[in-house]
Amino acid sequence: MVLCKPLTAPCATEIGVTERGDDILIVRKTDALWGLPKLMQETRVDKGDPADPVNFDLRRQQTATIMPIAVAFPVAIVLWFGTYYMLPPLAGMEDVVARLVFALKCSCVAILFCFVTGIEAVAHERLRSPAIDPLSGYDTPRMRVNLRYLQNTLEQLAPFVAGVFGLAVYCSDGRSIRAVPATTVVWIAARIAFWIGYHRSSAQRGIGAPGMVVSILVLLYVCTRFGFEIAGTVGAIVPLVLFVGAEGLLFWATKPLHHR
């Protein structure tokens, strides 16, 4: 492997070629005989290592992550209410079973366009690269992003699906059930935005944050309604208080450790 100094410019040697990204230096070895790139020998060197508190600018990364989030939330709110009010009331939704079936259909749409597409993206890249052998150790930045997207989407599917099913239970008619497709549209859009943003930079994945937030809000609504059924107003307040307390505890417990 050949590293070129300074890191601000690309360079070439008899055995290697470097390319400079915004935050990454990529070094590729070339075949000494044929001069062809060896895909198995691509090396990525982080210039700002998060494990190194001296060189990693946390505040800059936080600012870069928060900005897309701030832009995404107003768009998500408009999208949710726009979907809700533009859809006509749905017929035959007075029966809870019909509403649950409708929630299942919405979940299927979300899984198809957000999860299955991620699986296909990884599968296509494996088919057309040395990664067709999963044990070869070959990967690319694109594949790593797609794999992280898949893992994150799988994690977020659980609260989303549970939320839309619970929401369907408490939507009493064809008018209020429109909240289910509105939530689904926002979640799908947020997942796609997260995926595209992640490929641009790790900070821009924050544009998908409204997807998780809408799932949390729906679950809180379902839990407060459930609590009200059990113990009235007090029962409705308890889940909110406990969740806010848990968030505060997690915020405190996950603060970074100071290195000497």
Locations of regions flagged by a protein language model:
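Hydrophobic core of alpha-helical transmembrane segments in multi-pass integral membrane proteins
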Residues: 69-85, 111-122, 220, 239-254
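Core segments of transmembrane alpha-helices
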Residues: 151-166, 217
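Alpha-helical transmembrane segments and their immediate juxtamembrane interface regions
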Residues: 180-215
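Hydrophobic alpha-helical transmembrane segments and immediately flanking/interface helices
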Residues: 166-192, 254-259
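Short membrane-interface loop/juxtamembrane segments of multi-pass integral membrane proteins
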Residues: 134-156
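Long, highly hydrophobic alpha-helical transmembrane signal-anchor segments
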Residues: 56-112
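Membrane-helix interface/capping segments
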Residues: 116-140
